[in-house]
Amino acid sequence: MFRFEKKHDLKGTLICVEGIDGSGKSTQLKILHDWLKSIGQDVIFTEWNSSQLISKTTKVAKKKNLLSPRTFSLLHAVDFADRLEQVIIPALKAGFIVLADRYVYTAFARDVARGVDANWVRGLYGFAIQPDLTLYYSVSAEESLKRICANREPKFYEAGMDLKLSNNPYKSYVIFQNRVNAEYQKMLSEYNIVEIDATKSIHAKQADTRAIVKKVLAGKGVQL
């Protein structure tokens, strides 16, 4: 199985959040980002599939439903590599707190849930650096679907429709996201990922998040 070669020795702190769609992780990260900035911390945000180099190509292909599971893996690995080199590492060298909405664990969970070989996927990210903290916001696929459907219908790939699990996108969503959740659960102890109950209120989740983040930052010499 994939192992990070070593912890980074850069001045900054890398904090990542993970979870299935609808877990509320992005909301929590935004609140955390705004709070850290408000108390004078140097902080930068980066998210999955946002590299200027390739994200537009990936989004066009997704809209046309053209991506096989392995192609998905490759495109996201290229995107990640570019952001790691151009955004994450420079910010860490400068002493910033880097907040990442999804990290390599997203690929490890989603791609394997799509049937891609686990060792192959992990091998794509052999260059990744180990985060200082990874938080996993845990919620059931059913609750996730309920939250998403309050605003929109499930998207083609997040519902796993490319896998032909069911002709019904709602049923397919639950099946696929359950698979993704199962992969995340396998990784918790393996990668020392901290689980947060995402069924709690937004305020309670943020309180849990800040308490953990404060401890990690204190270990890096940052007292909040």
Predicted regions and their residues:
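Walker A (P-loop) phosphate-binding loop of P-loop NTPases
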Residues: G22
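Extreme N-terminal, non-catalytic leader segments
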Residues: M1-L14
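ATP-dependent small-molecule kinase phosphotransfer cores
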Residues: W35-I129
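Hydrophobic anchor at the beta1->P-loop junction of P-loop NTPases
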Residues: V17
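Hydrophobic positions on the alpha1 helix immediately C-terminal to the Walker A/P-loop
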Residues: Q28
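A glycine- and Lys/Arg-enriched "phosphate-lid" helix/loop adjacent to the NTP-binding pocket
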Residues: A107-V180
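Conserved lysine of the Walker
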Residues: K25
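Conserved nucleotide-binding/hydrolysis micro-motifs of P-loop NTPases
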Residues: S50-Q52, V104-Y105, V139-L145, I202
